[in-house]
Amino acid sequence: MKVRPSVRKICENCRLIRRKRKILVICTNPKHKQRQG
């Protein structure tokens, strides 16, 4: 899980999800997991 000031999709399988005011990126590739905060 990478914590970044700006999250974005890295590949086609990445999905942006908003959960409890946090923006997450969930992907089939575990390296692409990101969280904003």
Curated annotation (Swiss-Prot):
The keyword Plastid applies. One of its GO terms (cellular component) is ribonucleoprotein complex. GO terms for molecular function: structural constituent of ribosome. SUPFAM superfamilies: Ribosomal protein L36. It comes from the Eukaryota. Signal peptide: none annotated. The keyword Oxidoreductase does not apply. Pfam families: Ribosomal_L36 (PF00444). GO terms for biological process: translation. Belongs to the bacterial ribosomal protein bL36 family. This is Large ribosomal subunit protein bL36c.
